[in-house]
C-alpha cells in the first residue's frame, strides 16, 4: 500500500514488518530505495516506476544487506545500484538463501528473479556525493544494525533515507556492534546541521515530517 505520496515522493509500505520502499522523482532521475517484500508489492513498485519514468535514469539505493531489503532488486536490472563497500563483501548466496527459505515457507512464487545487486556506486566514507543534474545524493555510513548500512540524503528535496534506524515501530536490532550503532545515531546531529531535512523515511514504520519527530 502507499503510506505517503506527493508529486515527487511515494512511500510504499509492505504488509510485512511495515517495511518501506521509496520512489523519489526529480527532473533528473528516479531513485528507488529497497524495493520489497511480497511479489505483488515489488511488482506494484516496478509498475509505478515504469509508468512515471519516461527517459530518466533509475538509481537503486540499497540501504543494507538484510534479505528483506534486497529481495526486490531483480525488478530493476537497468538501474544504477548504490550500496556500501561492506555490502559488496557479503556472501550473496547466504542472503538470497534467507529469502528462498521465507518464500518456501509461505509457498511464494516470484516473477522477478532473486538477485544480489552489484554496486555501481560504492559508498566507502561519509559525505560521498552523487550529483545527477540538479539532484544531489549525499551518503553516510550507518553501521550497527548491520555492518554495511548507509544513510542517503536527497537534495534539494531534503529527504533523509534512514534504513533500519530511527524507526517508530521497530526495536533497534544490533548485529554489528553497539558502539557502531551509537556512532551512527550520533550522526543525526551532523546530518541535521548540514542538510535541511524535510522528511525522514525509516526502513520500517512511518515517515517523520519535522525535526521534533526525528529527534
PLM segments and residue spans:
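Active-site HxH/HxHxD metal-binding segment of metal-dependent hydrolases
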Residues: 41-129
Amino acid at each position: 500500500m502507499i503510506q505517503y505520496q506527493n508529486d515527487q515522493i511515494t512511500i510504499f509500505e509492505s504488509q510485512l514488518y511495515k517495511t518501506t520502499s521509496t520512489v523519489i522523482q526529480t527532473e533528473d532521475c528516479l531513485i528507488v530505495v529497497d524495493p520489497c517484500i511480497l511479489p505483488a508489492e515489488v511488482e506494484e513498485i516496478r509498475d509505478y516506476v515504469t509508468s512515471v519514468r519516461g527517459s530518466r535514469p533509475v538509481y537503486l539505493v540499497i540501504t543494507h544487506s538484510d534479505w528483506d531489503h534486497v529481495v526486490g532488486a531483480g525488478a530493476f536490472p537497468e538501474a544504477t545500484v548504490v550500496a556500501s563497500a561492506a555490502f559488496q563483501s557479503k556472501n550473496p548466496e547466504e542472503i538470497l538463501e534467507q529469502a528462498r527459505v521465507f518464500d518456501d515457507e509461505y509457498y511464494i512464487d516470484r516473477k522477478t528473479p532473486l538477485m544480489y545487486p552489484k554496486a555501481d556506486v560504492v559508498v566507502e566514507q561519509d559525505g560521498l556525493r552523487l550529483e545527477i543534474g540538479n539532484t544531489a545524493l549525499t551518503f553516510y555510513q550507518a553501521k550497527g544494525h548491520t555492518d554495511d548500512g548507509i544513510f542517503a540524503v536527497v537534495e534539494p528535496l531534503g529527504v533523509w533515507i534512514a534504513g533500519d534506524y530511527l524507526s517508530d515501530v521497530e526495536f533497534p536490532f544490533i548485529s554489528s556492534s553497539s558502539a557502531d550503532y551509537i556512532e551512527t545515531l550520533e550522526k543525526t546531529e551532523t546530518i541535521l546541521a548540514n542538510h535541511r531535512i524535510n522528511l525522514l523515511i525509516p526502513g520500517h514504520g512511518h515517515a517523520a515530517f519535522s525535526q521534533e519527530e526525528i529527534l
